[in-house]
Amino acid sequence: MLEAMAEPSPEDPPPTLKPETQPPEKRRRTIEDFNKFCSFVLAYAGYIPPSKEESDWPASGSSSPLRGESAADSDGWDSAPSDLRTIQTFVKKAKSSKRRAAQAGPTQPGPPRSTFPRLQAPDSATLLEKMKLKDSLFDIDGPKMASPLSPTSLTHASRPPAALTPVPLSQGDLSQPPRKKDRKNRKLGPGGATGFGVLRRPRPAPGDGEKRSRIKKSKKRKLKKAERGDRLPPPGPPRAPPSDTDSEEEEEEEEEEEEMAAMVGGEAPAPVLPTPEAPRPPATVHPEGAPPTDGESKEVGSTETSQDGDASSSEGEMRVMDEDIMVESGDDSWDLITCYCRKPFAGRPMIECSLCGTWIHLSCAKIKKTNVPDFFYCQKCKELRPEARRLGGPPKSGEP
């Protein structure tokens, strides 16, 4: 018996330790408490009407047991002092709501407004006014994202409804439109000014500069471009007028452009340009070309078709004419008339006569660009020197 009594003696200290580690006064939160808490928050925010259970839940008992329970509950969640403060604020909110429900008078809730202006449960009318104010602020601000979160809007939203209805609307209406105008001025003023500046000044300038540079290069390096395989230029008449108009525009431009115009003006003078115009084609029936019935009679009818053939030729055909085209003849050769068709060079491929050294268009000589002979004789040389057909004349190349 003594042994039996002695055995439980070492087991006695654990029961004494259990109440110390786990006090029986501790209360764990349940789902019902959480639901009550959520319903109270929703009722306070004004999303749902307050009920009797919600008003009676926080105010049951005196203030001291509530604080004790709040302290115990805070230990259940977190022992931080912030939880105690939040619970105490909710208790005060519940007390104020209970007083309003008990008194049910619109005049008496005035003191709580002065003491706790932000803890009041707003009515439906005040909620509607707040929503209208928010909508008006969003409509005025538009795409600006920082305006709803600005301190002014937050202060207006946090104010009580009595001061919120007259003041913020007038201030918002007076302060927001100037911002909108400022935005429009910012969008239209600097952006529009730059846009108009780009449209008026910079765009035409580079375009004209590019045209002038192209014309200048075409006049100086037209033959080199033909060697590289660029597209063939159309006949002389369409190409000459643009140079005239561009030269006139260059004279009206700034000093730098006038210098370029002076350089181009010396290359392509105005009186020489009328030569490739309409009166020139009738001159194809020239006394020089009339006697040879073999070549000239066909050349007069085939000038138009030959020009079309020149325009539709391929790039590979132009490479064959490297030796027969005047490459380093200078800019004056553009309007030079040497062929018996009385049309200028105009960048079209030509071939040099091996005897007299005159340059003649391949189209007038009826020579294909793919089949260029080593020795060529013009109609005059063939008529005056028939032995040129037999012997071939001196071995003179087509280089200039």
Swiss-Prot record:
Zinc finger (PHD-type): 336-384
Keywords attached to this entry: Acetylation, Autophagy, Cytoplasm, Metal-binding, Nucleus, Phosphoprotein, Ubl conjugation pathway, Zinc, Zinc-finger
Compositionally biased spans, kind Basic residues: 92-101, 178-187, 213-225
Composition bias, Polar residues: 302-315
An annotated GO cellular component: nucleoplasm
Transmembrane segments: none
Cellular localisation: Nucleus; Cytoplasm
UniProt-listed Gene3D superfamilies: Zinc/RING finger domain, C3HC4 (zinc finger)
Gene Ontology terms, MF aspect: zinc ion binding
GO biological processes: autophagy; negative regulation of autophagosome assembly; negative regulation of autophagosome maturation; positive regulation of protein ubiquitination
N-acetylmethionine: residues bearing it: 1
Assembly notes: Interacts with LRSAM1.
Name the record gives this protein: PHD finger protein 23
Gene it is expressed from: PHF23
